[in-house]
Amino acid sequence: MALLQISEPGLSAAPHQRRLAAGIDLGTTNSLVATVRSGQAETLADHEGRHLLPSVVHYQQQGHSVGYDARTNAALDTANTISSVKRLMGRSLADIQQRYPHLPYQFQASENGLPMIETAAGLLNPVRVSADILKALAARATEALAGELDGVVITVPAYFDDAQRQGTKDAARLAGLHVLRLLNEPTAAAIAYGLDSGQEGVIAVYDLGGGTFDISILRLSRGVFEVLATGGDSALGGDDFDHLLADYIREQAGIPDRSDNRVQRELLDAAIAAKIALSDADSVTVNVAGWQGEISREQFNELIAPLVKRTLLACRRALKDAGVEADEVLEVVMVGGSTRVPLVRERVGEFFGRPPLTSIDPDKVVAIGAAIQADILVGNKPDSEMLLLDVIPLSLGLETMGGLVEKVIPRNTTIPVARAQDFTTFKDGQTAMSIHVMQGERELVQDCRSLARFALRGIPALPAGGAHIRVTFQVDADGLLSVTAMEKSTGVEASIQVKPSYGLTDSEIASMIKDSMSYAEQDVKARMLAEQKVEAARVLESLHGALAADAALLSAAERQAIDDAAAHLSEVAQGDDVDAIEQAIKNVDKQTQDFAARRMDQSVRRALKGHSVDEV
């Protein structure tokens, strides 16, 4: 029975009517578009039979070119030829300048600190550049299918954060495309692989593209694709292989580090050509800037070995998250052009103890999976029982009193998902509540990441604990988070969609997870202390209000005993002895029991005053 039917109301077509849909792999280095024709998913080629479209755009005053034509201008007009724009999506200018200091583009910052690229066509942001690539792919599909597309599925790296995913959606909208769904690239590969092989069990999807690395551990069972865990690096890929090799060639050739952009581009082109050749040959001759030399596969392997090791460390973390051992993995699916590098295949095979699968073209498999999914979502396969369960990489929650984090959705929860929890007011007469959305695995706010803040106003003025606020976290199929807070009695609500301007790297995510394990015992103790301090503050706040209203109900001796107990609680609450605070709270409760009973009796008498027994 289906756990999650992937279909959208209103999109099912009549039996005789077929809607046109496409899957788009919007890659860092190359992009592809695919569709399903006659029951088979296939990538679409250009007029020259080329399936890959270089993710490069060349801008001029009178227009722009995309793909191969644009790439030929890279060395001639570097500043106006934008490549690997996917790496810039959702990042601030400061982040880009820190991560990629050698980019040959001139940047300006927008008012909110986001990057604007200076080109002959004016200031352009990464969303606009991505939109131009998507337009070129859509035009190829429209021509091949002889009709306008009804919808597309676009793939993104599993580690893309909210801002990067939203930027991809915005680019598609700018390109005039209806986005059926954003799909994680490893998951798209699982769809293509699962349909073609029909195997069941645990599968690892190792996706090393031009600019990103993703590892996904999936369980395939009777048409259900469940992502058990994900990991990776949003800033590691074949481009890094190219730059390492280019730097090595530059050193061997004696080319100055600060040479002009044209020489830098020649170096990079030579490195790319050498990398490709070394996948088949043991050595290759390189000619660049008047220098000629030999590069061996062994030398290349030494350069990239640390990067390959980083990918395997991410694989190890993902396996741990999934709760499986490497020998439980039945197959390893290779995705991305960079998996053609022999050292990558060799080390991955050694790590998992089996040769990786390479029967499906690693450049095309993601686009093929996206096309299959698009065909379902557009309504051409309304009875399909394919299931697709993605996960969120870090827990989501709220700040509560005392600087604590209350987790609402734990990490590795499958998405889409909606979870709700009820909260209440801390003070008498409280009419507003600040909602602080957190991300992370630790117990205290100071150790987690702040995502967003918003306020719920218009809460009825009731005694502390009298108002009930339901906070709902909803993560959609694209990984975008919406948080809604609603006061139950009035229905007043406030909400926010979380779109951070830039997100976390995989190393930061891994560090947060590691810290949560390393400091688990310490965090639990800190949480217990914070909870007791919050309870102490609540008790004292309530007691002070009661004394201000009804102190006349107490004798002098009783008042003194209560004051002494409250003073002691106030004192120990400043320390870090959890047991002492707990005992002091119990003592205040003991000293005020009679006082509370008298206040209750007085309230009842006041309520009954002026009423007859019959009325009661």
Curated annotation (Swiss-Prot):
GO terms for biological process: iron-sulfur cluster assembly. One of its GO terms (molecular function) is ATP-dependent protein folding chaperone. InterPro entries: ATPase_NBD (IPR043129), Heat_shock_70_CS (IPR018181), HscA_NBD (IPR042039), HSP70_C_sf (IPR029048), HSP70_peptide-bd_sf (IPR029047), Hsp_70_fam (IPR013126), ISC_FeS_clus_asmbl_HscA (IPR010236). Keywords: ATP-binding, Chaperone, Nucleotide-binding. Belongs to the heat shock protein 70 family. The gene is hscA. Pfam families: HSP70. Chaperone involved in the maturation of iron-sulfur cluster-containing proteins. Has a low intrinsic ATPase activity which is markedly stimulated by HscB. Involved in the maturation of IscU. The keyword Kinase does not apply. This is Chaperone protein HscA. Gene3D superfamilies: 1.20.1270.10, 3.30.420.40, Actin, Chain A, domain 4, Substrate Binding Domain Of DNAk, Chain A, domain 1.
